[in-house]
Amino acid sequence: MAPNAATKKRAAARDDDFVLTLSDDENDIFENGVEEDGDNAQEDTLSSSKKRKREAAEAPKGKNKKQKQLKKSKKGESAAGAVSDDQSSEEDEAEAMDAGEDDGALDSEFEFDVGGNANTGVIEGFDGWEARNGASLADAPKNGDKKAVDIDDIISRRKAKKEAELKKKQQKEKKRREEEGEEESEGEDADSDGGMSVDFQDDELLAADGFGMGADGADESDDDVENGSNDSDDSEGKGSEDEESGDEYNDDDAASDNDSVATPVHHPDDEAASDEESEAESEVDAEEAEKRKAFFAPEEKSTAVSTFNRSFQDFNLSRPILRGLASVNFTTPTPIQQKTIPVALLGKDIVGSAVTGSGKTAAFVVPILERLLFRPRKVPTSRVAILMPTRELAVQCYNVATKLATHTDITFCQLVGGFSLREQENILKKRPDVIIATPGRFIDHMRNSPSFTVDTLEILVLDEADRMLEDGFADELNEILTTIPKSRQTMLFSATMTDSVDKLIRVGLNRPVRLMVDSKKNTSMNLTQEFVRLRPGREDKRLGYLLYLCNEIYTGRVIVFFRQKREAHRVRIVFGLLGLKAAELHGSMSQEQRIKSVENFREGKVAFLLATDLASRGLDIKGVETVINYEAPQSHEIYLHRVGRTARAGRSGRACTIAAEPDRKIVKSAVKAGKAQGAKIVSRVVDPAVADEWAAKAKGLEDEIEEVLQEEKLEKQMAQAEMQVTKGENLIKHEAEIMSRPKRTWFETERDKRAARKLGATELNGPSKKDKVKLSNKDKKRLDDARQRHEGNIGWKKGKADREAPKQGKNKGGKTKSDKKNKIKMKGKK
């Protein structure tokens, strides 16, 4: 009887204090409309403790977790201690059954997840321009940016203003006509219709099949039909595409441009240049070869074949690294990754080269993360520095590295211009493991941030190393290399890596391993290269050709490269006035504007990205279909980097270059390299009449372009004035704090910085025209005398040496002084 009394006590306590949770089959109860009486409810409560184990075993895991949470919360409300003890013991048993502790059997549906990707979402379309949380970089807060001037706002305001003026003018005209009277106006209209004042010179009023129409261009149209130029709307490169005539730069198609133009013969410079190139390629200096043999470590040929097509798991990487690779959907390593990762894990210096879009960033980030997993954690220390030539490339590398290190405790910091110095200093105080920076901002913090030390750096990476070794970055790179420890691992990567030992030896490499996946500087095999030739005398129509291509052929996901910032900005205004959605990217923009332009292009808000060579290196934007070169670049290496923005990671793409006579050398080298590689080379012929029509449209916008530029200039001046006012207010408000800060120092003078910038511009755009220097009066007089002598106005003026020389003229007797001297000598001998 004792057990029955205890059971009744428990039931009474449960009825008073314990609130029942809803069962798993509550929906069935409500659907059937069955309500339980009090007695039935008591019976269910009495038997609930016996059924709980069975319900917990049959219910799904998700529901069990919710029930446990509810039971735990209700358990605290119970007043009877005995009841709570029984419930807790029963819940522990249910949890043990849920955890699989009742027996040692393994679930038949269990799958071992190597990459650890079961609970983390795979990033299907991995893009290096997304923030770590998936948000857009343009939405991230930025400090220190200047107030931006939006060209689209200026153009839209001008359009709205013109529409308002036109509407106002129409209303005035309508009001004037109403005042004059409708009958009189109708009579005037009837008279004007009755007179034969139609201008038959207007082509729009004449039928296309009328007498004499099309006679002038009949031959040209026939040629165009034969060449297939009417199929220019096809994105697969229709028009006139001739793969066989690529190396001769389509000289046989002169008749398609103008029948009166004779087919030109081979240019003599082509043959001379080709001879020089062949000699330079065939004759490798023996001394340079000996230098390379002594400088580079011997290559291991046996490992190259065995490591082909292996997976990331074969590298014996740690599980957090494999999970990070799986989260961004990296499964099979690329050739450069297969070669680099094992060597980098050994701590050796590396000089690596591969085609654009082959995964060079992951090739050096993965071994760095693997080595950092085994670092001492007692004292936080900065151990890795990755240097990039541009801000965009540094931001992109930072995003890729942070995503790969999602499942680790490795910390990162990006030091690039355009972001707040104070925020970067606060991050550097925490001593992040990896620092991704541009050289200028890295040196700034190295000299002026007391919390930043480089004495503990163990790994140095130079991405786009050939650009970093050029004259524009030489001084900054030397400053960094002489400051950081010499006992470090150094890795250099680029698509166009140099082999010059004299340049590489400056970096302080120690017997580096040379990993050249593509040593011939080739393009992607999925890239189709097109060339549009401008005949001599048509260089001023270049913008017309570009507008035709962007309106008719390539209408979306296009990057257009320019040599100069001024030209890119001007074309950006032309595109806006013609209704083409475009963004620009160059060095004169603020960091906020630059990131916003890339984000708008990446998200498809704009169809065209007008950029300088700032975006030619390393920029990885998913889905770029076409690259257009407004003019050929300075060198073949820059051309490879430009066209490498498309056809990345196995995708297809097109590159179109608008080339004139001065661009012949670059086009010839590109065609030669493409044919040697087996790439698709195509010549596209554009109807000159169509190009002239677009060029005329652009020329008609000259006045409006100047007005937009003037309005933009005024807005910039206003923004500058506002900034100066704010600066003055801050100086007054925070005078003590500002004056107490130490002055920031730099290792170069302003003159040296200007010289370095000039050298960098020369590397990209070639030597500029000779700078104008004010001549002194002495130089002016010398030039005037030379011009007068050349014109024959005055004779040659004797110099001092001519005036002091003895005269050789004849005397009165007809004999010279030398004759007299010889006669005296002869008399002495007699």
Curated annotation (Swiss-Prot):
Span(s) of short sequence motif Q motif: 310-338
Annotated ranges, domain Helicase C-terminal: 542-689
Name by which UniProt lists this protein: ATP-dependent RNA helicase drs1
Alphabetized UniProt keyword annotations: ATP-binding, Coiled coil, Helicase, Hydrolase, Nucleotide-binding, Nucleus, Ribosome biogenesis, RNA-binding
Sequence ranges of Acidic residues compositional bias: 23-42, 87-112, 180-192, 217-234, 241-256, 271-288
Substrates-to-products reaction catalysed: ATP + H2O = ADP + phosphate + H(+)
Lineage: Eukaryota, Fungi, Dikarya, Ascomycota, Pezizomycotina
SUPFAM superfamilies on file: P-loop containing nucleoside triphosphate hydrolases
GO biological process: ribosomal large subunit assembly; rRNA processing
Motif, DEAD box: chain positions: 463-466
